[in-house]
Amino acid sequence: MVGLALLARLEERFLPEKRKVSPARRVSIIGISAAIAAVLHVLDFPLVILAPEFYKLDFSELPVLLCGFYLGPSATVICEGVKILLKLLLKGTSTAFVGDLANFVVGCSLVLPATIFYHAHKSKHSAIIGLAIGTLVMTVFGSAFNAVYLLPKFAQLYGIPLDTIIAMGTAIRGGVSNVSTFVLLCVAPLNLLKGAVVSVLTMLLYKRVARPLFGLHQ
């Protein structure tokens, strides 16, 4: 909460062109975006040609980005948090909240850089650059987060040796031999794919969706 309040203050100081909306409308936009994101999150699916099946691909950051492009970076953090809460209500957790935490923090690593850069420059070009930066940050951060926290935690959660998870990666990508190559050859491509698809959809849909959904007039 302290970090979110600080982010909001920084927005006011360094992003003066951020769109002003009433508190009620802001809550409404975040709520609608989070609800759509939660549904997309529930519809996640494995992509076993890239990573073991317990890694799921979803495009729930799309409505979060649309919300953030409209309202600003702090809205994306709130939207991500509400998305996770709604997903837990709809589907529960199968990973003792480990996967839910990962989705939140890795999602934020995409949407925060993208929306911060966009609102700092406010143009189509800056949106493209921001999304590229966000995808790169998510790929690097997601890989590091997996190596340091997520993979050991999954091994502990499922009661299996870490080497067993590495072997799952080896079965998919022959070059996987340790944690480093696992995140490089399995996790990073998955995050790159997600970032690329979400970025393209954001650019295609923002103006089309923002007008009817958010009341965008410019």
Positions of PLM-derived features:
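Loop-helix junctions at membrane interfaces
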Residues: M1-Q218
